[in-house]
Amino acid sequence: MAHRSHTGTGPSQRQLRVGELIRRTLADVLNRGEIHDPELNRLSITVGEVRCSPDLKVATVHVMPLGGKNVEEAIALLSKHRGELRHHITRQMTLKYAPDLRFRPDETFDRLDETRRLFSDETVMRDIRGGGEADED
């Protein structure tokens, strides 16, 4: 079997696959309330994306509580239970190392709102339809 290394600028297929498995595992654990903390279980947290480092030792988890409120509280609670969450991940996956979990706010929805706002702008709509005037040099 040939050994190939990933030389591209983006994440490798393995990073993407492991990140998605971690995302699904964390989402299931949080959805089922398997972490025994009433403060954490009262929050409905969405795990939007997990990005893994090339060596798969660090996983950055992008999360957002339902409604977008209490983001810092959710991240603090998840960080507090990092070890227990890692334990759930290692039970579901066979990796050489259990990845260190780092929690960050998921800004995908903010970017989506900004994109929608841009597309609703009249100048942008005119450019999309081809009605804009071409710049002449």
Swiss-Prot record:
Q: Name one GO cellular component term.
A: cytosol
Protein's UniProt keywords contain Cytoplasm: yes
User: Which GO annotations describe the biological process of this protein?
Assistant: maturation of SSU-rRNA
Where does it reside? Cytoplasm
**Assigned keywords, A-Z:** Cytoplasm, Ribosome biogenesis
Q: Name one GO molecular function term.
A: ribosomal small subunit binding
Q: Which InterPro entries match?
A: KH_dom-like_a/b, RbfA, RbfA_dom_sf, Ribosome-bd_factorA_CS
- PANTHER family cross-referenced by the UniProt entry: RIBOSOME-BINDING FACTOR A, CHLOROPLASTIC-RELATED (PTHR33515:SF1)
Known partners and oligomeric status:
Monomer. Binds 30S ribosomal subunits, but not 50S ribosomal subunits or 70S ribosomes.
Q: What does this protein do?
A: One of several proteins that assist in the late maturation steps of the functional core of the 30S ribosomal subunit. Associates with free 30S ribosomal subunits (but not with 30S subunits that are part of 70S ribosomes or polysomes). Required for efficient processing of 16S rRNA. May interact with the 5'-terminal helix region of 16S rRNA.
Which protein family is named in the record? Belongs to the RbfA family.
Q: Which NCBIfam families match?
A: PRK00521.2-5, rbfA
The name on file for this protein is Ribosome-binding factor A
Organism, scientific name: Cereibacter sphaeroides (strain ATCC 17029 / ATH 2.4.9) (Rhodobacter sphaeroides)
Primary gene name:
rbfA
